[in-house]
Amino acid sequence: MEKTITIYTDGACSGNPGKGGWGALLMYGNTRKEISGYDPATTNNRMEMMAAIRALEALKEPCRVELYSDSAYLVNAMNQGWLKRWLKNGWKTASKKPVENIDLWQEIVKLTTLHRVTFHKVKGHSDNQYNNRCDELARLAIKEQS
């Protein structure tokens, strides 16, 4: 039977662009795993995406995933058909401009083919303890490298 994993992700940037960090929390049953990372020159959107990518890469086998993010950019691209349209249009937006962050979107395409991922939007910086923990991990990743 396919495992269902719950993942919370968040990204942060000190300046946008600037130093960035990402954090993710993976939960399965009573098991919790926290991961985080840093980039010296990035954007907030890239860190939001990187959190999701690294969390999905951490899974050891194909899983069903409930992924929670406060990034409208990430969640809307997945749930409102933006990504499908970009693929169909050769990585061009509706206004015929190149899609930003193509490298990361291509990684997300690969990972969402391997795993069955449902994306959920959560309100950032509110009372969601898991999202708040991911925000803390992302900010700590920046602080530890500064």
UniProtKB/Swiss-Prot annotation:
Cofactor annotation: Mg(2+)
An example Gene Ontology CC term for this record: cytoplasm
Q: What is its main location?
A: cytoplasm
**SUPFAM superfamilies noted in UniProt:** Ribonuclease H-like (SSF53098)
Please describe what this protein does: Endonuclease that specifically degrades the RNA of RNA-DNA hybrids.
What does the record note on quaternary structure?
Answer: Monomer.
Q: Which family does it belong to?
A: Belongs to the RNase H family.
Protein's name according to its UniProt entry: Ribonuclease H
The organism named in the record is Chlorobaculum parvum (strain DSM 263 / NCIMB 8327) (Chlorobium vibrioforme subsp. thiosulfatophilum)
**Which lineage ranks, top first, belong to the organism behind this chain?**
Bacteria, Pseudomonadati, Chlorobiota, Chlorobiia, Chlorobiales
